[in-house]
């Protein structure tokens, strides 16, 4: 038989599910009666789940788990003690009873706050350091207007008398006139080569 094995499995599953023939299990009831249900809940063969997923009906209350490891309300404490006088006595000494008092330190919040504070201080210190370095670097560079007045050879001494600057060099001469250019002899004043060699014979 050729084909996909998944189609064969799907066919077998559908034929099994759609089977309407009477079976022996149809005579059994789904729900248990009160005696059987109580014996199931109180049997020692069943493994307790230790109050996982809020199964408080199956496991007894625990004061340390419900009120000391986490905050509990008056009703939760009453469920544990099952007596109003014992509950009131406990509630007066409970630190989260709503009447104030000093509670325990939340370590996670303290760690997050301290880490954030230290990080903020480090970032502020780095920002101040970079700003001071930028100002120091900017203070060492002269302004463009002052750059022409300060000679690189003169020492910068604000306390002493200013040293005189050397006189500026004379301006370069301008272009010569036409007559001056003709009268001047230069390298390129030679006559042009003769054109006899370039003529074609007729």
Curated annotation (Swiss-Prot):
Q: Where is this motif: PPXY motif?
A: 192-195
- Give residue spans on the Extracellular membrane side: 50-109
Location within or outside the cell:
Cell membrane
Any coiled-coil regions, as ranges: none
The record ties this protein, via Pfam families, to: Gla (PF00594)
Do you know which SMART domains this protein is assigned to?
GLA
* Cytoplasmic face residues: 131-202
Q: Name one GO cellular component term.
A: extracellular space
Which tissues is this chain's protein expressed in?
Widely expressed with highest levels in kidney. Also highly expressed in the thyroid.
- Give the recorded effect for residue 178 to A: Abolishes interaction with YAP1
Ranges that cross the membrane: 110-130
Positions of disulphide bridges = 67-72
GO MF: calcium ion binding; serine-type endopeptidase activity
* Swiss-Prot/TrEMBL GO biological process terms: blood coagulation
Q: Which residues carry this modification: 4-carboxyglutamate?
A: 70
What broad class describes the main subcellular location of this protein? membrane
Would the keyword Disulfide bond be found if you checked this record's keyword annotation? yes
Task: Identify the stretch(es) annotated as Disordered.
Answer: 143-202
Q: Does the keyword Repeat apply?
A: no
Domain Gla per the UniProt entry, residue ranges: 50-96
Q: Where is the composition biased (Pro residues)?
A: 158-175
Point out the propeptide residues.
Answer: 24-49
Protein name in the entry: Transmembrane gamma-carboxyglutamic acid protein 2
Q: What organism does the record attribute this protein to?
A: Homo sapiens (Human)
Q: What is the lineage of its organism?
A: Eukaryota, Metazoa, Chordata, Craniata, Vertebrata
């Amino acid at each position: 038989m050729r084909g996909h094995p998944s189609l064969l499995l799907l066919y077998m599953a559908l034929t099994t599910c759609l089977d309407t023939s009477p079976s022996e299990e149809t005579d059994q009831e789904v729900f248990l009666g009160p005696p059987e249900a109580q014996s199931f809940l109180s049997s020692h063969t069943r493994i307790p789940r230790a109050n996982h997923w809020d199964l408080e009906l199956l496991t007894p209350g625990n004061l340390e788990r419900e009120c000391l490891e986490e905050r509990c309300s008056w009703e939760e404490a009453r469920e544990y003690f099952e007596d109003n006088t014992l509950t009131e006595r406990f509630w007066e000494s409970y630190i989260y009873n709503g009447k104030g008092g000093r509670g325990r330190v939340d370590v996670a919040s303290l760690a997050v706050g301290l880490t954030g504070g230290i990080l903020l201080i480090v970032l502020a210190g780095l920002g101040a350091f970079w700003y001071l370095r930028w100002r120091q670097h900017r203070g060492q560079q002269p302004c463009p207007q002052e750059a022409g007045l300060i000679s690189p050879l003169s020492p910068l001494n604000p306390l002493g008398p200013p040293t005189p600057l050397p006189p500026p060099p004379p301006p370069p001469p301008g272009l010569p006139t036409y007559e001056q250019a003709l009268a001047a002899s230069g390298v390129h004043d030679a006559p042009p080569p003769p054109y006899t060699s370039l003529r074609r014979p007729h």
